[in-house]
């Protein structure tokens, strides 16, 4: 059992490579369309928010909105839920950050020269060179800004990936073969200990998402994470700031219900008015 995450530059050919590897390995292929559809299952409102915020750099105002924070939390919970299923190719969505340190996950970035990216877009989308260049610049700026805001890192920094491939210097067939082999090498790393790390991360993300999207939970700051990475017996920690003291009990009850037998601790503080607190998604 293994996982492949692919971050790609727009027009690099990364999407085709991801599909090809998924087909060769008979892995599930999870892309933007599937994740947005899953988020929409939380309600039509969240489906609309997903379309509004997806892969775009939010404005200074938007980044503090309840809807943006809820969208990010839902997106991360869905990615980790798919990762639990194994045998999956996850396209983008910050999967490389969410699965950092998971030994049976192979995290790659695919890039290409500007000239090759423009050529692909002119052929695929029927754009002229000027419009293709403009679109690439816009997408790079929006996606790069969104990733930096959420994860605090540059999305094209090689240190956040196991491998970086360049379709301008390597043939797609060679990249596909290499990626396939590397994914298969990681199957043996799917140990019980490694799986517990992923399970606890996924549980924390599920709790965070459930709290984040509930409009009756007046949260101005939120941090939900494993208390000790991979150690289920220590459970998860929920920290936050609320501006309605009566909501604390409901938040705690919701988290406990999701966690079941897994321990959960709380550090929820009350402040009498809402503040622009920090939400931890990294």
Protein language model features and the residues they cover:
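N-terminal targeting leaders
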Residues: 101, 119-123, 148-159, 164, ...
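Divalent-cation
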Residues: 92
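Conserved phosphate-donor/acceptor-positioning beta-strand/loop module used by diverse small-molecule
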Residues: 101-124, 132, 136
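Conserved nucleotide-binding/hydrolysis micro-motifs of P-loop NTPases
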Residues: 95-96, 112-117, 169-171
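ATP-dependent small-molecule kinase phosphotransfer cores
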Residues: 35-87, 127
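Short hinge/gating elements
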Residues: 3-6, 61-65, 164, 190-194
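Glycine-rich phosphate-binding P-loop
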Residues: 4-21
